UniProtKB/Swiss-Prot annotation:
Taxonomy, superkingdom: Bacteria
Family: In the N-terminal section; belongs to the pantothenate synthetase family.
Record-annotated active site: H11 (proton donor)
Cystine bridges: none
GO cellular component, one term: cytosol
Its EC number(s): 6.3.2.1, 2.7.4.25
CDD domains per the UniProt record, alphabetical: CMPK
Function summary: Catalyzes the condensation of pantoate with beta-alanine in an ATP-dependent reaction via a pantoyl-adenylate intermediate.
Descriptive protein name: Bifunctional pantoate ligase/cytidylate kinase
Involved pathway(s): Cofactor biosynthesis; (R)-pantothenate biosynthesis; (R)-pantothenate from (R)-pantoate and beta-alanine: step 1/1
SUPFAM superfamilies xref list: Nucleotidylyl transferase, P-loop containing nucleoside triphosphate hydrolases
Source species of the chain: Synechococcus sp. (strain CC9605)
HAMAP family hit by this protein: Cytidyl_kinase_type1, PanC, PanCY
Amino acid sequence: MPTMGGLHQGHGELIRRASEQGPVLVSVFVNPLQFGPAEDFDRYPRTLEADRGLAECCGAHALWAPSVDAIYPSGLPSAVSRSAPAGLQTHLCGASRPGHFDGVVTVVARLLQLVEPSCLWLGEKDWQQLVILRRLVVDLDLGVVVKGVPTVRESDGLALSSRNQYLFPADRARAAALPAALRHADPSDPESSVRQSLAKAGLEVEYVERVDPRTLQPCGPETAISLLAAAVRCGTTRLIDHVFLMTRQPLVAIDGPAGAGKSTVTRAFAERMGLVYLDTGAMYRSVTWLVQQNGVDHQDAVSIAPLLNDLDLQLKSLPGGGQQVLVNGQDVSDAIRSPEVTASVSAVAAHRCVRQALTAQQKAMGAKGGLVAEGRDIGTAVFPDADLKVFLTATVGERARRRALDLEQRGFPVPERSELEAQIAERDHLDSTREEAPLVQADDALELVTDGMSIEAVIDALVGQFRSRVGEEAWPTPAG
C-alpha cells in the first residue's frame, strides 16, 4: 500500500480492508517527482512516528520508509523513467499539474519492482491516479491485482486528505462546500451548477469536468455512468473530489459461444457485485423445452409463435447462488440442460418470433440497470448501451472438456470428446451465421479467453473490469 505519509483514517480503512486479504506492507515515501516547482513538497506532512502507530493499530504488518537514494539510486535528475499514458492525463489534475502523473507511475513502478506484491491497494479519492496505476500494472504485465477502496469522509462530507491539516478553521468550514456542490449538482448541467456553487462559497475553481470513468475523456449526459470531478483552492490548500453521476444502475453484458462458462462465472460475478443475474440462455432453453413438450417441429416458426403468447417464464435466484427456472409453473431447471434441448436450442433461438419475444422481456428486466446478463447477443442486440461488455470464450477443445464434465455431473450420457467438439463447432457455426441476432463480439467488448483460467480468476477479471468503470463509493460491494 503506497503512501506519502501523513496517514489518516482514510489510509486506516485501506489498511483494514487489505489486512483481511493477507499481510500488509505500508510504504511511506514523499516522492519529489510528483511535486511541481511551486507546490508543497517542503511542507508536506512528515509524521513518521504517528504514521507507524496508525498503521500498526489498523492491522499493517510492516511499515517501510525508504530514502530517496534507495528509490532513485541514479539520482533525481535522471529518475523519471516512465510516462503516464497521454490520454489519461489530458484532463482533470493531469492538465493542471504537468509531469505529476509521470512522477507517480515512476515511483510506483519502482516500488512494485522492489516489493513484488500480489495486490496493490489504493484509495478511490484520487480516481485519476487509480485509473493510471491500473493501466501501469496492465502495461507492465506485473500480475498484480489493483484494489480500490471508497473515499472516507468527515461527517460533513469532506474527503479525508493529508493536506486537510493545512486548512485554517475558516477555510475548513468553507471546504465542505466542495463535496456538497458535487453531491447536489444539477443533472441538466452539472459542471456549470457546481462551478456556481463553488464560486458562491468563495472557493477558487481549478477545474470541474465530467468524464468517462475509464477513459477520463469528456462525456455528456448520454453516458449512463460518468465521473464529475473538481479541484479547488481553499485558502492555500488544494482539494480534489468527485462523484459518480448515474442515470440508471450499472448494466453488464456478457456474451460468448456455448460452453465458455458464461453461466457459472456470471452468476458468481452477479452475487459478488450485488447485481441481478439474467440467464438469457436459460430463457431460450426454456422455450426449446416447451417446443419439444408440445411436439412442435423446432424448425417451424409458425407453430412455435402461438406457444409464446401465454408463456409464463420465471427465473428465481436460490440461496447459495443457484437458479430455479419455471415454465408455466413447472420447474424445468434440470430438464432444460438435457442433451436433447442443447441439440435444438440454437435452431429455436434463431426464429425471429422467439428472439423478439424474449428480447423484449429482457429489455424490460434491464431498463433500470442493476443487472448482469449473459447470452449470445446481449451486448449487440439486447443491451447495446451496457456499461461493461465482455466476450467470454475458450477454445473448442476446452469447451468440450467442460461440457463432458457438466453432462457427467448431471447424470447424462457423455459422448466421445471428438463428438462433443464437433457438436460445439456446429453450434458455433449456427449461432454465428443465423440471420436473426447472430453471435458476434460487440466492437466495444473486451475479449476474455478463459483457457487455463480458474473460475475464481475469471470472476476476478470481471470484477476488475467492472471496478474500472464503477467505483465502490457509487456501487458498494455487498457485505460478506
